[in-house]
């Protein structure tokens, strides 16, 4: 009994000493680990600042291994992988972050946004769209919608693009009316290509309502009406571009000529073209004027004179080539503007 008591008295101090020594060793190891993680982290930053991305990645991997619970290191590493085009590794890093149960709500949103960027950069648009949808209702919602809009435009998914553009407008972003009209125009072209001219015309009317000042819906509608044999309606639609002074009006000049000739509206169309040309000289409008004036008896002489006048107002190689067709270069008063145009071409 006395012997047992002696051993107990001897063992208690020894056990206490061993416990104290073990705790000191654990504390020392913890301090070493904590020093190693920041050291590796700052080493990675140094490499990054010196544009040594390979070494920076190695340093960040070391830091993550030493402190796997540090989310900032994961974000830094994932972003580095994405910048280098190593999208699969970036995806793995950000998916690992999302799998952690202790991640804060803010960091979870950041990781989801980073993962969506990985998919976009990798060209995995379906997975990117799914990842971006999960950001609805977060602080990244606006950015995510813009990214989805870019995806839909890239993949020509016009109804979805229009839906997202409407959401962006409702959330206080800038007006997307012109882009939404463009989506309707693209849908109209697809319908027309499949033989649904009526449906295409309806979409173009909707586009005109969406963006009254956008020139493309009227231009496409006028061309559609012309191709459908509705020359008078086409003439009225295309004339609106010139009456409004649209900068895109010259693009409709050739179609207006065809519509006016088919609808027997040459005098009114010619007057409209001449008024527009007087305000904004343009070779496309001049070509249209010449085309409508060619019915006159002295058409050839008038054509040459028109292009000479245009060369004096707006020297260009294209106008000079129009005049040169069958022209006599002998006269000095005509040679000078032609020469000037050729020199400036």
Where are these regions (language model features)?
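Structural motif corresponding to the intra-repeat A-B loop/turn of tetratricopeptide repeats
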Residues: 50, 84, 122, 155, ...
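Short coil turns that delineate tetratricopeptide repeat
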Residues: 68, 102, 106, 139-140, ...
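Alpha-helical segment of the N-proximal tetratricopeptide repeat
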Residues: 33-69, 82-86, 121, 186-194
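Alpha-helical repeat scaffolds
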Residues: 91-99, 125-136, 159-171, 196-207, ...
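Long, contiguous interaction/recruitment modules in multidomain scaffold/adaptor proteins
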Residues: 1-35, 130-133, 137, 142-150, ...
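Start-of-helix register in tetratricopeptide repeats
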Residues: 38, 72, 106-110, 143, ...
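Structural register within alpha-helical repeat arrays
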Residues: 43, 77, 115, 148, ...
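Residue at a conserved register position within TPR or TPR-like alpha-solenoid repeats
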Residues: 47, 81, 119, 152, ...
